[in-house]
């Protein structure tokens, strides 16, 4: 199996390593002529389809299209692809005009300009820093229960409301507690034409203190 079948990750890099093309493109403007100094970049492994396959011997990662030189600063070609995981980087060199990939032997070294390298930390994902927990928004309740002296058409406490549910001091046309209501169901202090508690009602069913023409409790009259 050729190297390209073994190490090629496809175009567009993968997480935690290097795929094919794509990745650390960009950088500084193209430099004309050889650099003042060069650093060891990789060792020759074998040729592959006209390119040179190298194993990186530098702790940093080269730019794509970065010029590659021999020790005497003669340009061999440019970085074409970067391959392999972060702890074992490989790269290929696309040879320049007049340079043959088969002219090199295993162990030959290639060099690069210092300004064409990126630190390996640029390719390592940074851990997420846990921040303080976000405060939870308390939902506001719409409306509020009424206290004493309820509103009309709502739920009241003492001193009931008209047309609603009342506590003490009943409501007209509703269900009342003490202090009955007219035409409704009353507690103590009955209502006219309804069902009363103590203090009966006229024409209804009364509790204590009977009612006229109704059914009385204690002290009732027929």
Swiss-Prot record:
GO MF assignments: box H/ACA snoRNA binding
One Pfam family named in its UniProt record: Gar1
Region (Disordered): 1-35, 124-222
Location of the region described as RGG-box 2 in the Swiss-Prot/TrEMBL record: 148-222
Keywords: Nucleus, Repeat, Ribonucleoprotein, Ribosome biogenesis, RNA-binding, rRNA processing
Gene Ontology cellular component annotations, sorted alphabetically: box H/ACA snoRNP complex
GO-annotated biological processes: snoRNA guided rRNA pseudouridine synthesis; snRNA pseudouridine synthesis
Annotated spans, RGG-box 1: 4-27
Homology family: Belongs to the GAR1 family.
Subunit-level organization: Component of the small nucleolar ribonucleoprotein particles containing H/ACA-type snoRNAs (H/ACA snoRNPs).
PANTHER family: H_ACA RIBONUCLEOPROTEIN COMPLEX SUBUNIT 1, NUCLEOLAR PROTEIN FAMILY A MEMBER 1 SNORNP PROTEIN GAR1
Protein's recorded name: H/ACA ribonucleoprotein complex subunit GAR1
Organism: Candida glabrata (strain ATCC 2001 / BCRC 20586 / JCM 3761 / NBRC 0622 / NRRL Y-65 / CBS 138)
């Amino acid at each position: 199996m050729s190297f390209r079948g073994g190490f090629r990750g496809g175009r567009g890099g993968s997480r935690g390593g290097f795929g094919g093309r794509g990745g650390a493109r960009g950088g500084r403007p193209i430099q004309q002529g050889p650099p003042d100094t060069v650093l060891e970049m990789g060792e020759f492994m074998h040729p592959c389809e006209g390119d040179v396959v190298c194993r990186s011997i530098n702790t940093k990662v080269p730019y794509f299209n970065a010029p590659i030189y021999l020790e005497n600063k003669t340009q061999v070609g440019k970085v074409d692809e970067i391959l392999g995981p972060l702890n074992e980087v490989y790269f290929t060199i696309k040879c320049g005009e007049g340079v043959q990939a088969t002219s090199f032997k295993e162990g030959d070294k290639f060099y690069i300009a210092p300004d064409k390298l990126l630190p390996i930390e640029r390719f390592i994902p940074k851990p997420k820093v846990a921040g303080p927990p976000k405060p939870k928004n308390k939902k506001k309740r719409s409306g509020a229960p009424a206290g004493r002296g309820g509103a009309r058409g709502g739920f009241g406490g003492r001193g009931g409301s008209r047309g609603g549910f009342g506590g003490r001091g009943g409501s007209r046309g509703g269900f009342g507690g003490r202090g009955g209501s007219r035409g409704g169901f009353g507690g103590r202090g009955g209502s006219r034409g309804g069902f009363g508690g103590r203090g009966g009602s006229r024409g209804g069913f009364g509790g204590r203190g009977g009612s006229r023409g109704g059914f009385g409790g204690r002290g009732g009259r027929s």
